[in-house]
């Protein structure tokens, strides 16, 4: 009985990942970083900057508690909830 109880305790400790936080790519450095507690969503925002796209395409990567809602209709936001799932987009 003691062996069974000890085994269950060890398995519980191994299976629980206490203090785990999500990892997402962030800008401007585009490197993987731990998200603050409570922020479990990775996001990628893309848009064209400047008049008629003269300044090029822009990207914002980061962490959030919920998927950010774009303030402008031309901002595309993609959210995911796995570690480092918000990689820098490939441009056509």
UniProtKB/Swiss-Prot annotation:
Location(s) in or outside the cell: Secreted
Matches recorded under SUPFAM superfamilies: Snake toxin-like
Gene Ontology molecular function: acetylcholine receptor inhibitor activity; ion channel regulator activity; toxin activity
One CC-aspect GO term: extracellular region
Lipid biosynthesis listed as a keyword: no
Residues spanning the membrane: none
CDD domains documented for this protein: TFP_snake_toxin (cd00206)
Alphabetized UniProt keyword annotations: Acetylcholine receptor inhibiting toxin, Disulfide bond, Ion channel impairing toxin, Neurotoxin, Postsynaptic neurotoxin, Secreted, Signal, Toxin
Signal peptide: 1-21
Main location, first listed in the record: secreted
SS bond list: 24-42, 35-63, 67-79, 80-85
Keyword Lipid metabolism assigned: no
InterPro entries found in the cross-reference section: Snake_3FTx, Snake_toxin-like_sf, Snake_toxin_con_site, Toxin_cobra-type
Tissue: Expressed by the venom gland.
Gene3D superfamilies reported for this sequence: CD59
Biological function: Binds with high affinity to muscular (alpha-1/CHRNA1) and neuronal (alpha-7/CHRNA7) nicotinic acetylcholine receptor (nAChR) and inhibits acetylcholine from binding to the receptor, thereby impairing neuromuscular and neuronal transmission.
Family: Belongs to the three-finger toxin family. Long-chain subfamily. Type II alpha-neurotoxin sub-subfamily.
Identification of the protein by name: Long neurotoxin 3FTx-Oxy2
């Amino acid at each position: 009985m003691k062996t069974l109880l000890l085994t269950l305790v060890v398995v519980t400790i191994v299976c629980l990942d206490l203090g785990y936080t999500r990892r997402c790519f962030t800008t401007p450095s585009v490197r993987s970083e731990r998200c603050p507690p409570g922020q479990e969503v990775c996001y990628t925002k893309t848009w064209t900057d400047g008049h008629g796209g003269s300044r090029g395409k822009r990207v914002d990567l980061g962490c959030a508690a919920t998927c950010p809602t774009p303030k402008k209709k031309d901002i595309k936001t993609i959210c995911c909830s796995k570690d480092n799932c918000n990689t820098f987009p490939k441009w056509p």
